[in-house]
Amino acid sequence: MQDDTSSEQNPTHCSAINSSVPLVQGALPTLTLSGKIRVTVTFFLFLVSTTLNASFLLKLQKWTQKKEKGKKLSRMKVLLKHLTLANLLETLIVMPLDGMWNITVQWYAGELLCKILSYLKLFSMYAPAFMMVVISLDRSMAITRPLPVQSNRKLEQSMTGLAWGLSSVLAGPQLYIFKMIHLENGPGQTEVFSQCVTHCSFPQWWHQAFYNFFTFICLFIIPLLIMLICNAKIIFTLTQVLQQDSNKLQLNQSKNNIPRARLRTLKMTVAFAASFIVCWTPYYVLGLWYWFDPGMLHRMSEPVNHFFFLFAFLNPCFDPLIYGYFSL
């Protein structure tokens, strides 16, 4: 979801972007009590997520060192490593940025960092969502269409590379649409407020609506649908297999039983999807509501607003707990 100072595009104001515009009607935003609570919770979750994800990366590194010479980590652990890196990136960029921005209320870092950090913020949100898609696809194919080990390795590398690449490309527009605006009391008077926003970056209001909706589809709807379809296929296939005669039970070269390790990773994949839904749904429901009814911010309690946004920060905290429990 993108920030903006107004729901309308004023041509006079738009011509003054990057210089200054008259102060809009109404009080400027300040750090309220609920805002302070949000900042406190944000930095607490930042410490939790950083500790958990960094610890899991360290554990994977030690696991790699214990491997016999010439042997590599399993495909699943490689995918978990990519997901952990993506979660760590989101933690180190999005959470401190959100916390500091809520403290300062306005933007003091200049236009260059406004663009760069806005790009990195969206990039670090795309990456973990796409990595969870890769894991869901990988587990689904491992159950329904098992391939030789070498083919699986190549497919895994292609999918993870595509996930990182798409994250980078889809976040690209942030470098263009985010700008600094400076508000002042009147012409020639002292500047009183600066902000990093998308104000006036779109010729028509529906252009911004389209961009926001496109981002919502790519960040939430598409990953969610893919994960749901993959998990449904996994559950359906396992149900069929478990209903067969135990003497004929065979899954991907395993005899007479489903390997426990594979069952663990399948349960983990389902848990990832559940975590994604629980953590991100409130965030995007609030975003969609705002896009169609900007006035809702004035009707909704500020603490409730902050609470919904904080839900999204739980996802990188839950993920290492999930894969730590199921994989090692």
UniProtKB/Swiss-Prot annotation:
It comes from the Eukaryota. It is a multi-pass membrane protein. It is found in: Cell membrane. Keywords: Cell membrane, Disulfide bond, G-protein coupled receptor, Glycoprotein, Membrane, Receptor, Transducer, Transmembrane, Transmembrane helix. The chain crosses the membrane at residues 39-59, 85-105, 116-136, 161-181, 209-229, 272-292, 307-327. Residues 60-84, 137-160, 230-271, 328 are cytoplasmic. The keyword Zinc does not apply. GO terms for molecular function: gonadotropin-releasing hormone receptor activity; peptide binding. Disulfide bonds join 114-196. Residues 1-38, 106-115, 182-208, 293-306 are extracellular. GO terms for cellular component: plasma membrane. Pfam families: 7tm_1 (PF00001). Glycans are attached at residue 18. Receptor for gonadotropin releasing hormone (GnRH) that mediates the action of GnRH to stimulate the secretion of the gonadotropic hormones luteinizing hormone (LH) and follicle-stimulating hormone (FSH). This receptor mediates its action by association with G-proteins that activate a phosphatidylinositol-calcium second messenger system. PANTHER family: GONADOTROPIN-RELEASING HORMONE RECEPTOR (PTHR24241:SF22), NEUROPEPTIDE RECEPTOR-RELATED G-PROTEIN COUPLED RECEPTOR (PTHR24241). This is Gonadotropin-releasing hormone receptor. It comes from Cavia porcellus (Guinea pig).
